[in-house]
UniProtKB/Swiss-Prot annotation:
Predominant cellular place of this UniProt entry's protein: mitochondrion
Family, per entry: Belongs to the cytochrome b family.
Stated name of the protein: Cytochrome b
Miscellaneous notes: Heme 1 (or BL or b562) is low-potential and absorbs at about 562 nm, and heme 2 (or BH or b566) is high-potential and absorbs at about 566 nm.
Organism: Oryx leucoryx (Arabian oryx)
Subcellular location: Mitochondrion inner membrane
Subunit structure, as described in the record: The cytochrome bc1 complex contains 11 subunits: 3 respiratory subunits (MT-CYB, CYC1 and UQCRFS1), 2 core proteins (UQCRC1 and UQCRC2) and 6 low-molecular weight proteins (UQCRH/QCR6, UQCRB/QCR7, UQCRQ/QCR8, UQCR10/QCR9, UQCR11/QCR10 and a cleavage product of UQCRFS1). This cytochrome bc1 complex then forms a dimer.
Membrane topology, as annotated: Multi-pass membrane protein
An example Gene Ontology molecular-function term: metal ion binding
Amino acid sequence: MTNIRKTHPLMKIVNNAFIDLPAPSNISSWWNFGSLLGICLILQILTGLFLAMHYTSDTTTAFSSVTHICRDVNYGWIIRYMHANGASMFFICLFMHVGRGLYYGSYTFLETWNVGVILLFATMATAFMGYVLPWGQMSFWGATVITNLLSAIPYIGTNLVEWIWGGFSVDKATLTRFFAFHFILPFIIAALAMVHLLFLHETGSNNPTGITSDTDKIPFHPYYTIKDILGALLLILVLMLLVLFAPDLLGDPDNYTPANPLNTPPHIKPEWYFLFAYAILRSIPNKLGGVLALVLSILILVLVPALHMSKQRSMMFRPISQCIFWILVADLLTLTWIGGQPVEHPYIIIGQLASIMYFLLILVLMPVASVIENNFLKW
């Protein structure tokens, strides 16, 4: 008799995706981040659901409802901090996952990669709107500054901003709609993640060498299920260390002050995971130019497959490309640091140089290095 997991319509899907899936025998720990992102998403949806049971999306009560969650709701504080720091863990996993894709040439799976870029945009939008909900000073001013950027769009800009705000400033209508969008988007992300997985399973996983692994496949279960469980335990360990010992380490103290439209904080900055893009935005003196650079800093990922000039897929055997990749990582860390600094000398010039370097590395130096490496191999 055939096993039920291979015949039942629903279990068959699960079986083909997580149990009998043929996987390369040599995929490293860099391949753990996909499953970790899934765990992060489930965790965020669950903690978010329980927070939504006690949160009120009204300008007069939003801040105090978050205080109520932390003070009066049973284990409300841990749910709130797991949600806030869970977002940080989510983005750490996202950046590692994208970095892995860049390093090992996984972007040659075009559909999987493009759905991944859409997922990145959706996650960034969700995180931004979630940051507005506690209605602290940085929530309010962050929302005001970032939504205001759309006014740089010629002709329709001002109307677009007022349409998003639901009025002439960030107010009750804005908060309510941001809560609605923040609630629905994670489910859209979950659906997109399934599409992402669907496209991936059409081709099978890449591996560190970038060479086809059809000759040496192993079943996903038990080999990679146990490996994913180890990754999950480490993820939860780091998350709980953050939540229980330093819950406000990655947050902004200004967000413990209720939103006040009459008082602008001295330094408006987003959460740490947006700082690199914020630094690129600020490095251009022109408003529209800054907005375009901000969007392109993420959208550039779509161009990466077209810029792949190497005859090898992975960077495993390409030392020059490896050097450029790690310079890019250092450049992104520099941008993250600059994004959190005030707009003054020498931070302005460092930010501008790091922004130029970012686009130069991806658009020029990586393809050039690939061509040089091809010539070395007499290909």
